[in-house]
Amino acid sequence: MESNGSGKFPGAFNDRILTKSNRDVTIMMGKTKKHIIYFAEDKVLNIDQKDIEHYLSEVKDAVEKDYYRLDRNARRQDNINLFLDYVIDEVKAKEIILSLTAMDFSEVLRNEHTGFEHERLYVFGKDVVLLERTGTEEKTVSLYIKFNKLENSFVIVISFHEQKYPLTYYFK
């Protein structure tokens, strides 16, 4: 979208201008350009902080009621490694999830597994201090946390591990 010549975009967009290529949606907030949503669909999505706060509220409600699962199976070795490398248990993981805020939100992804393409996966990041299991040092660990909230409100924590690359945060 072109600027109106003043360097500003039309006010009708409230500083949230989304553009789309074949797979990539980009948002402009003020002068900041962020890639946020990766869909191959022909629609533009608009997410605001209230949307994420609502989503997190539903996730936290499920977690508080133990209506969730943190995946630690053979396909989720990175999740297992977090629990092997640091002194962390399910209780601490639950505390971390319950401490998430909209400011920790990074992006929404489409589930790429065949038959589940309609599902949306929400990615968050969180810096936490954890004790290394093989040492005496505490370390600030940047976590990558990805949720799938199913239609029945059950939450699957698909990813809960150290970030492999720095995340871009949507509201920061």
Predicted regions and their residues:
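Functional cores of ribonucleases/endoribonucleases
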Residues: 102-154
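Extracellular glycan-recognition regions
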Residues: 16
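Compact soluble domain cores
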Residues: 7-9, 13, 21-124
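A short, surface-exposed interaction/processing loop segment used at functional sites
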Residues: 147-172
